[in-house]
Amino acid sequence: MAKRCALTFKGPMVGNHVSHANNKNKRRSLPNLRSIKIQLDDGTTKRIKVAASTLRTMRKGA
């Protein structure tokens, strides 16, 4: 299952863990996904995964 927002398509970012000795190890920063139910035009409900930042924007009404 992809760790990606269904609306904004935000996905994992790649970065480095950097130690005091300046050694670098790869790390993944995953999006904060939440499972929500959304009602479609035909009246059925569907469960999708949405990033928390997208959910805040939806609730704000912007």
Swiss-Prot record:
Keywords: Ribonucleoprotein, Ribosomal protein. The keyword Ribosomal protein applies. One of its GO terms (cellular component) is ribonucleoprotein complex. GO terms for biological process: translation. Gene3D superfamilies: Ribosomal protein L28/L24 (2.30.170.40). Signal peptide: none annotated. SUPFAM superfamilies: L28p-like. Transmembrane segments: none annotated. The keyword Ligase does not apply. One of its GO terms (molecular function) is structural constituent of ribosome. Belongs to the bacterial ribosomal protein bL28 family. This is Large ribosomal subunit protein bL28. The lineage of its organism: Bacteria, Pseudomonadati, Campylobacterota, Epsilonproteobacteria, Campylobacterales.
